[in-house]
UniProtKB/Swiss-Prot annotation:
The lineage of its organism: Viruses, Duplodnaviria, Heunggongvirae, Peploviricota, Herviviricetes. It is a single-pass membrane protein. The keyword Phosphoprotein applies. It is found in: Host nucleus inner membrane. Phosphorylated. Coiled coil: none annotated. The gene is NEC2. Its main location: host cell. This is Nuclear egress protein 2. Belongs to the herpesviridae NEC2 protein family. Forms a heterohexameric complex with NEC1. Keywords: Host membrane, Host nucleus, Late protein, Membrane, Phosphoprotein, Transmembrane, Transmembrane helix.
Amino acid sequence: MASGKKLIDQLCSVVSSFLCPSISSLDIDRCAVGPHIFSRGSSQAICTVKLLHGEVYNLEFVYRYWAHILEKYNFPFSPTFIICNNGLAVTLKCYVSEPRDLSSRYGQATSMALDVNLQRNSFVVLSQDDFIKFKTPLVFAKDLDITNSMVVCRTYLTSSRNSLQFLVVKSKNPRRLENVLDMIKRAVEATGSNLPATREKPLPLEQTEQLESTLPSSGHLRVLQSTSLTGRCPSWGAACALLLLSLAVGLMAILAAKLMQWP
């Protein structure tokens, strides 16, 4: 259970830090810790975020970050994000696997598109394949990787209409971005090797079997244009490890702050 709580803390921290850097404090509701939330097809979202009008949300980046964390825990499923409108609010629900009976829970399914009119009792499913399908007509095959392009969502939420605009943004300097990612990766790996007590352990998946049931760009971002897209004090070793961890966190915070800067 301790490793499960640690995983939930990590996933929610990614959402809070990187989903929408322009919002100082997200309206986020975390789930209660329990083994059932990691079961295949669980109906319990890890967290639910209320979306606001006129904001840009870094959906693919957060999704890819989640997938990376789950892979480190040897988790066998891919995360699923769902944007739904229940008539009272438009929310983003983040699951570690695709929940069952989506239609009965959230209503009418709507595909990801450049412009989505999210009517009451409708939802959009966001998975790894959905991001790739959306980007394929808009970028070259070599640019499909998250280090070269990513999907964001701009919200238009009013009393009369709830609309989502999915956009693809591309870094002006992919090489610099890759170098920064490598630097953060090395710092985090070094920290993990020096702090054995905090090393991550695979999650117990007995519940799963029973039920069978890496980044904000360091440069500016630009919207890719298309014919229909015009928007846009311990030992010395432990002390060194803590210093490296602080460096990694600081780098990610700086990158997150720059993510929403446009040319």
